[in-house]
UniProtKB/Swiss-Prot annotation:
Family: Belongs to the LolB family.
Source organism (scientific name): Francisella tularensis subsp. tularensis (strain SCHU S4 / Schu 4)
S-S bridge residues: none
InterPro entries attached to this UniProt entry: LolA/LolB/LppX, OM_lipoprot_LolB
Positions of N-palmitoyl cysteine lipidation: C27
Keywords assigned by UniProt, alphabetized: Cell outer membrane, Chaperone, Lipoprotein, Membrane, Palmitate, Protein transport, Signal, Transport
SUPFAM superfamilies named in the record: Prokaryotic lipoproteins and lipoprotein localization factors (SSF89392)
S-diacylglycerol cysteine-type lipidated residues: C27
Leader peptide range in chain numbering: 1-26
Name of the protein in its database record: Outer-membrane lipoprotein LolB
NCBIfam families assigned to the protein according to its UniProt record, in alphabetical order: lolB (TIGR00548)
Any single GO CC term annotated in Swiss-Prot or TrEMBL for this entry: cell outer membrane
Keyword field contains Protein transport: yes
Record PROSITE patterns: PROKAR_LIPOPROTEIN
Encoding gene per record: lolB
Length: 207
């Protein structure tokens, strides 16, 4: 094979690689820390976050219940009413996935078992002894209240939620990141109800 043909192939390969890099970069989610000097318009922020219907959050969750403590890595995807929560790591039961919508929920574990129910709470209590409030989480993880349901809240110096009480849950937020230059989203959340406490650390957002 001639040197000219080899050089042409190399140039073509480099061109393809460059196109892929540019494509991936354009789809990447940008995240910057929210400084104490940044003050957001509360109404604009709320409506922007309310309209945000699709995202992926990755991180670690700590669970404290009945004098027990567990932790796991998670990947949480939301697309409208459809959701998927994958838990894996030191849970002691292998990986599990809970997915569903407003009508039904499926729980699948690493042993190949699949269980269904009308809501995530029922399945998770039966299988894990604790639960994630999926119906509220799709709002609370964005640091906004469920619309048209009674709540009390406090704001921080950035005009973002620092505390929220709703549906029997007490939720506190610390640390925010500005995602895609538009969405101030939390990176640390603590949720408590009765004898259950969830500590959620969000390491990355993708929207």
């Amino acid at each position: 094979m001639s040197k000219l043909k080899i050089d042409t192939k190399r140039r073509f390969s480099l061109l393809i690689a460059l196109v892929l890099i540019i494509s991936l970069s354009s789809c990447a989610t940008t995240q910057t820390n929210v400084t104490t000097k940044t003050v957001f318009n509360q109404e604009t922020t709320y409506h922007n976050l309310l309209k945000l219907k699709k995202w992926q959050a990755n991180g670690v969750i700590g669970i404290i219940y009945d004098n027990q403590a567990e932790s796991a890595n998670y990947t949480y995807l939301q697309d409208g009413d459809n959701f998927s929560i994958k838990l894996y790591g030191p849970l002691g039961i292998g990986s599990i996935e809970i997915k569903g919508d407003t009508n039904s929920v499926l729980l699948a574990n690493s042993k190949g078992q699949k269980l269904t129910a009308k809501d995530a709470k029922t399945l998770m209590l039966e299988q894990l002894g604790w639960y994630v409030p999926v119906e509220g989480l799709k709002y609370w993880i964005k640091a906004i209240a469920i619309p048209n349901i009674r709540q009390t809240s406090e704001l921080n110096t950035n005009n973002l939620l620092s505390k929220l009480s709703q549906n029997g849950w007490s939720i506190s937020y610390s640390n925010y990141q500005l995602v895609d230059s538009k969405y101030p989203l939390p990176t640390k959340i603590r949720m408590s109800r009765d004898n259950l406490t969830l500590k959620i650390v969000i390491k990355s957002w993708q929207i």
